[in-house]
Amino acid sequence: MAMSGFGTHVRHQPSAAIIDLQGEINTLAENVLNAAYDEAVSQQPEVILLNFSQVDYINSTGIALVVGLLKRARQAGLPLIAYGLSEHYVEIFQITRLADFMPLFPDEGTAWRAIAIWVERV
């Protein structure tokens, strides 16, 4: 699913959905991003992971779109986890306090290990 420099791919795993993001997250990404989220929750996952490893650019509107996904996930009682952000965007997520509400991990393997530890504690 691609649109003006942005695309997604949703992968379903047992109890989780991973949304692979590619390209630029800006105004043009809104419909594609929301459709990917809808597809991800259609399988009733226990957690959603956002894979930013192929994201080239996120503008302020893109940050707002991520906040919108976070809001939807929180309303549904779903943890939203991000991984693969560049150092620059990790810093932006920390400055904007998104990282306070959405755990950030360097890669998918690290995110899965954290999820496994979290599941053991619950």
Describe the residue ranges of each PLM region.
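STAS-typified acidic loop motif
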Residues: 2-35, 52-54
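Short leucine-rich amphipathic alpha-helices used at interfaces
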Residues: 7-8, 47, 88, 116
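Conserved beta-strand segments of alpha/beta enzyme cores
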Residues: 7, 101-103
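Amphipathic alpha-helical interaction surfaces in cytosolic regulatory modules
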Residues: 27-101
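Acidic-residue sensor for enzyme active/binding pockets
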Residues: 24, 91, 108
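A charged, well-structured terminal subsegment
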Residues: 104-122
